[in-house]
Amino acid sequence: QRTTGRDALRTNILAARAISEMIKTTYGPKGMDKMLVDALGDVTITNDGATILDKAEIQHPAAKMLVQVAKSQDSEVGDGTKRAVILAGELLKYAEELLDKNIHPTVIISGYRMAMEEALKILDQMAEPIDLNNEELLRKVARTSLTSKAVHDAREFFADIAVKAVKQVVEKRGDKNYVDLDNIQIIKKYGGALLDSMLVYGIVLDKEVVHPGMPRRVENAKIVLLDAPLEIEKPEIDAEIRINDPEQLEKFLQQEEEILMKMVDKIASVGANVVVCQKGIDEVAQHFLAKKGILAVRRVKRSDLEKLERATGGRIVSNIEDLTPEDLGYAALVEERKVGEDKMVFIEGCKNPRSVSIVIRGGLERLVDEAERSIRDALSAVADALRDGKVIPGGGAAEIELAKHIRRLATRVGGKEQLAIEAFAKALEGLAVTLVENAGLDPIDMVMKLRAAHEREDGKYLSIDLATGDLVNMREKGVIEPVSILANAIKAGTEAATIIMR
């Protein structure tokens, strides 16, 4: 069935709002979780906006746009996906009311754009500086991100891990902080409790030591990072060797052994006592390494090898002949440990590692998966705060403050755009209303309370304590978030709403 004109626009708005309404109930610290069952019967229980929209099989093109908004928000800042989607839904809800009053979509879009620019300007003025040394404030940022997650009860513990991990991998580039979260390795292992999770100042390899005769623990490790096989590879051309008598075979095998022996001798001669190899290690080479007391791990992922390079200060070597003592990495301890059902190799105690690992434990498979999503959001929040160098109050305080300023802008703008700008202010309030509704409080009462509070001199940090319904200062309560999460959500939500209205 083909729809055109206003009917098509209304259908698109309806579809996009359906997605927004679906996400709304999961928003905020009192938000619910969703259980998603796919075609194969696999169950995912999550509160994470990006995951919900990724797993939901959505067909409608307008609704798909909101899914893309969530994905772009997730890849850009790593958190605040629900906020972008809910804001887009609210903007479309009020746009529909304006369309009913015969206001043209172009006028609405123009008003929304003006309001968005004003909001971003005010947001920048509201923001407070934060730096690397203010660890307590960074912890508050991580804690705020974890408040609405399944790991809520262990949020102090995980916030601490997130801050320590990000501080370890942050780099100064000019006067900016640069954080590459790929340098933080996250490993999930079922078993134990959430509080058994740990931060390792080094790298954890999900591998075993290759030979039973090798040491399981090496202190003051000098590590070779090898991107070449410790085995004799077959030639690329189809060659064959014809052997006429047993002596020739004996010599042939002896020659192979000598080549491998030379490789191992070269490794031992530079003072190495640990080998981490990306390719295979021949059984004969394993035997020689074990005799020399060298611990070896094989078939390690390239990405893990690169992280090890950053953690240990070593260099990846592609040819054993070129190996020198300067190429070796250093770690205080390399040890094989049993974690859950599996054995893993811990390389830790590295000097000032630029790459670290977080091992997440938990009794339930789904809990560990959700804990991983939560810790990624917390890491992103801390990284964003350091990148921006600015933070704002959370808990709906910033949204209410922005709505107040945008209403003032509406009074200064003539024409029908004024109505669209007011609608934008209502949509921003809609984010705070959703928090309040999900906590089971009366939204109308609370919004009136908040509007009045924000007119006061000291009002910009005030929002509702969702447990009691009282007004509290979010900054003093430690509810703080990076400015980029809200700024990006406003940009992405407004763009999505305007594209759908076009």
Curated annotation (Swiss-Prot):
Q: Which UniProt keywords apply?
A: ATP-binding, Chaperone, Nucleotide-binding
Looking at the UniProt entry, the stretches that span the membrane are none
Q: Domain of life here? A: Archaea
The signal peptide here is none
Q: Name one GO molecular function term.
A: unfolded protein binding
Entry's SUPFAM superfamilies? Answer: GroEL apical domain-like (SSF52029), GroEL equatorial domain-like (SSF48592), GroEL-intermediate domain like (SSF54849)
Which InterPro entries does the record cross-reference, listed alphabetically? Chaperone_TCP-1, Chaperonin_TCP-1_CS, Cpn60/GroEL/TCP-1, GroEL-like_apical_dom_sf, GROEL-like_equatorial_sf, TCP-1-like_intermed_sf, TCP-1_chaperonin, thermosome_alpha
Q: What does this protein do?
A: Molecular chaperone; binds unfolded polypeptides in vitro, and has a weak ATPase activity.
Family named by the database record: Belongs to the TCP-1 chaperonin family.
| Record's subunit section | Forms a Heterooligomeric complex of two stacked eight-membered rings.
Task: Provide the protein name.
Answer: Thermosome subunit beta
**What organism is recorded for this protein?**
Desulfurococcus mucosus
Gene symbol of the encoding locus: thsB
